[in-house]
């Protein structure tokens, strides 16, 4: 039975609009290929990190994904996120 998840991505702040849209659409396509439904993507904007750097960046662009998925689909997507150069960090939570 699918469960509700929320994944927050922190992506490189130097991505322009077109590469960012390509990144988001490719990530949504990967989710849908794994049987994920009800995908909502919210751009939370650029934020400065609190006194530290991530891969030499002092700020990042926060993108929130809300979706319903099976646990194995989430694991497959997270594997893809770990190797993506544009994603600085990510975290997934099960909600509900």
UniProtKB/Swiss-Prot annotation:
The keyword Transit peptide does not apply. One of its GO terms (cellular component) is ribonucleoprotein complex. InterPro entries: Ribosomal_bS6, Ribosomal_bS6_sf, Ribosomal_S6_plastid/chlpt, Transl_elong_EF1B/ribsomal_bS6. Keywords: Ribonucleoprotein, Ribosomal protein, RNA-binding, rRNA-binding. GO terms for biological process: translation. GO terms for molecular function: small ribosomal subunit rRNA binding; structural constituent of ribosome. The keyword Lipid metabolism does not apply. Pfam families: Ribosomal_S6. HAMAP family: Ribosomal_bS6 (MF_00360). Binds together with bS18 to 16S ribosomal RNA. Belongs to the bacterial ribosomal protein bS6 family. PANTHER family: MITOCHONDRIAL 28S RIBOSOMAL PROTEIN S6 (PTHR21011), SMALL RIBOSOMAL SUBUNIT PROTEIN BS6M (PTHR21011:SF1). This is Small ribosomal subunit protein bS6. The gene is rpsF.
């Amino acid at each position: 039975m699918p469960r509700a998840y929320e994944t927050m991505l922190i992506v490189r702040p130097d991505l322009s609009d077109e590469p960012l849209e390509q990144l988001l659409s490719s990530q949504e396509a990967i989710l849908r290929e794994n049987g994920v439904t009800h995908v909502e993507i919210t751009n939370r904007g650029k934020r400065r990190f609190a006194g530290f750097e991530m891969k030499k960046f002092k700020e990042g662009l926060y993108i929130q994904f809300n979706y319903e998925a099976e646990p194995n689909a989430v694991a497959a997507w997270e594997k893809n996120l770990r190797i993506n150069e544009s994603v600085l960090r990510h975290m997934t939570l099960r909600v509900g």
